[in-house]
Amino acid sequence: MKEKKAQLYEGAYVFSVTLSEEARRKALEKVTSGITNYGGEILKIHDQGRKKLAYTIRGAREGYYYLIYFTVVPGVIAELWKEYHLNEDLLRFLTLKADAVKEVLEFASLPE
């Protein structure tokens, strides 16, 4: 049986602004540990800061955005999505295949 090769992914995650800094760090750690627990590797995490949402999600108008580049075997993505749906601190997430890790992102954050 042929072993599947890990692919590069770009994950966008939006966390609730009601979280304290410590709770937000733990929520992000829960996402990253989920990836590594399935044999994935975190390559880069971009903290994009607090931003206004395009529309209200669960009563929230703003969220903390993170962009994570990671590698994992493709079959793991469905398992990660199941975990993300159970994470109440995570307002939204999106996972896409990526061609390369972007080292620099340019976004403006809202003032705290």
UniProtKB/Swiss-Prot annotation:
- State the InterPro entries in the record: Ribosomal_bS6, Ribosomal_bS6_sf, Ribosomal_S6_plastid/chlpt, Transl_elong_EF1B/ribsomal_bS6
- Pfam families from the UniProt entry: Ribosomal_S6 (PF01250)
Keyword Kinase appears in the UniProt entry: no
Q: Which CDD domains does the UniProt record give?
A: bS6
Family stated for the protein in its record: Belongs to the bacterial ribosomal protein bS6 family.
The free-text function statement in the UniProt record for this protein reads: Binds together with bS18 to 16S ribosomal RNA.
Give the protein's recorded name.
Small ribosomal subunit protein bS6
* Organism (species): Chlamydia caviae (strain ATCC VR-813 / DSM 19441 / 03DC25 / GPIC)
**What are the leading ranks of the lineage?**
Bacteria, Pseudomonadati, Chlamydiota, Chlamydiia, Chlamydiales
